[in-house]
Amino acid sequence: MYSTIFNIGQINKYSKLAIFMSILFLCGCSSQTHSSQKETTIPVTLHVEDAKGLPVEGVQVTIVKAPSSDEEPSTEIGEILGKTDKNGDIKWDTGRKGDYSVALTKGETSVTHHISLTEDKKDHAIPLVFKE
């Protein structure tokens, strides 16, 4: 039989190392969360209306971040917000500053708009026309 004898100094050294590694791990996780929180969201309402200015209910709204230049393809995945309500409105709470393509779809008809989301649009309605 083998006997294992631990020196109290060795146990202390290993527990200090484990605590140090845990602290490093937690700091690394919180810094990633912190960096994503620095870019604040700009909540807006998208208001969809027809050519006569009347609200359009039931339009599916999909948003895609525009590429940084015309020569680059978009690698972003679209975010389906859902469908507009009876007032033609849909809330977008996760938008960040930048340029976006907004696809409006109802039945077989689809219309695309390009919008720029900036701080001055925060908590405002962005009008979009849906021509059937």
UniProtKB/Swiss-Prot annotation:
Domain of life: Bacteria
Pfam families (alphabetical): DUF2606
Protein name: Uncharacterized protein YbfJ
Source organism: Bacillus subtilis (strain 168)
Lineage: Bacteria, Bacillati, Bacillota, Bacilli, Bacillales
